[in-house]
Every structure is written in structure tokens, then in C-alpha cells.
């Protein structure tokens, strides 16, 4: 017999809230300087022309313009902003 009470049901009933990661502005969309384009963990997408990267790897626009997703090389992506 068990020498402790069964407490699985109370211990298992938890879940962490979502982190709201992902693409916030899509290709061809107009952005203003400072707009967040992607929130990510790590550099799944790299910073291209006219975009900056925050310390949490958030990619944001440095100028007003249009978002363009490109390939950096065979297995890396980058995102750039080009003026209108």
C-alpha cells in the first residue's frame, strides 16, 4: 500500500502562459522606425539591412520602410527594411 496520499491531481494542474513570440510585421508590410518585426528566442532569423537586434534577439526597424524577408545563405534567414 502507498504510504503517502495520492496528490497527482493537484500537482499536475499547472501551465505556463505563452510568451507571445513570432513575426509581428510580415513581408511587404510598411513599418516605422522602432517597430518590432520579430520576437524570437535565439537568432532563428538574423538582422539584415536597416534593422537592429535587441539583447533578447528581438528584431526591430531602424528606418521607415517596407519589410523584406531574405536568405542570408543556404540555411540562414534574414529580414531587412528598405525605404519606400
Curated annotation (Swiss-Prot):
GO terms for cellular component: cytosolic large ribosomal subunit. It holds the Pfam family Ribosomal_L27. Transmembrane segments: none annotated. The keyword Ribonucleoprotein applies. GO terms for molecular function: structural constituent of ribosome. Keywords: Ribonucleoprotein, Ribosomal protein. It comes from the Bacteria. One of its GO terms (biological process) is translation. PANTHER family: LARGE RIBOSOMAL SUBUNIT PROTEIN BL27M, RIBOSOMAL PROTEIN L27. Belongs to the bacterial ribosomal protein bL27 family. This is Large ribosomal subunit protein bL27. It comes from Campylobacter jejuni subsp. jejuni serotype O:2 (strain ATCC 700819 / NCTC 11168). The gene is rpmA.
Amino acid at each position: 500500500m502507498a504510504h503517502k496520499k495520492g496528490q497527482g491531481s493537484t500537482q499536475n494542474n499547472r501551465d505556463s502562459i505563452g510568451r507571445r513570440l513570432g513575426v509581428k510585421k510580415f513581408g511587404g508590410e510598411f513599418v516605422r522606425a522602432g517597430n518590432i518585426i520579430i520576437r524570437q528566442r535565439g537568432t532563428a532569423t538574423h538582422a539584415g539591412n536597416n534593422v537592429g537586434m535587441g539583447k533578447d534577439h528581438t528584431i526591430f526597424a531602424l528606418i521607415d520602410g517596407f519589410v523584406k524577408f531574405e536568405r542570408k545563405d543556404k540555411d540562414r534567414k534574414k529580414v531587412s527594411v528598405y525605404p519606400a
